[in-house]
């Protein structure tokens, strides 16, 4: 007894027939029949509910129907199970095709029917149950028309509504940020402030007052002061005395705001004392006034470029 006869004699015969629909009647084989070579038939049992639905269909290729002159139209259960005849000539289901299911897992099976996708998605074209559909002609025409309109709009210099919306959002953000930062008042930065150049050397100190363009207004050195001539100009307080003298002269000239630039290969403590001495000479040691708006150290910094000269032997 082969596998087909075992399927036919099983208790789930009706479920097997319903699962492989399109059969009007079933021939029950005897135990001496193989089901394929044409054994003896005992009775034909029609399937309930199937005769009325399939009365208009032809009996070609069904088991138990009258044979046709063309024997190639007859198919076995193996062919039906493999789904070889699941599509007709004009794209319709064949009489012996397996039934369709609206389950989402049906598209993964090898016997998915071509009309399954059309049943689950009636608005989309049929692609044979593969789950993918080619774009229709109307959607392609709409896409080409929209792209042509965008090109014409860009060529004519027009601006789309999307760009206008983005521009409005940017303008609103600019107004908000401007409103936030308007509460913070910027200090009055002096653009044409005079500059005080303090150059501190080992044996002398040079202090020069210039305008914003570099024109010299006044200058002084440690040796120019009457009290610091000779060896006294090499003392520690010579830079402070020179800066204080220039502070008094700058006050007499009517300067209001200055920028101090210090230069010298020494620690910043001496530079700080010179800057404070200039402020005291300008304000007559009054702490409520300060003409200095900016301080900058312009000392050159070596980046191991040139070799230093040989140190002097003592």
Curated annotation (Swiss-Prot):
Classification via InterPro entries: Ribosomal_uS11, Ribosomal_uS11_sf
Family annotation (SUPFAM superfamilies): Translational machinery components
Membrane-spanning residues: none
GO biological process: karyogamy; polar nucleus fusion; translation
Self-association and partners: Component of the mitochondrial ribosome small subunit (28S) which comprises a 12S rRNA and about 30 distinct proteins.
Similarity comment text for this entry: Belongs to the universal ribosomal protein uS11 family.
Protein name: Small ribosomal subunit protein uS11m
Encoding gene (name): NFD3
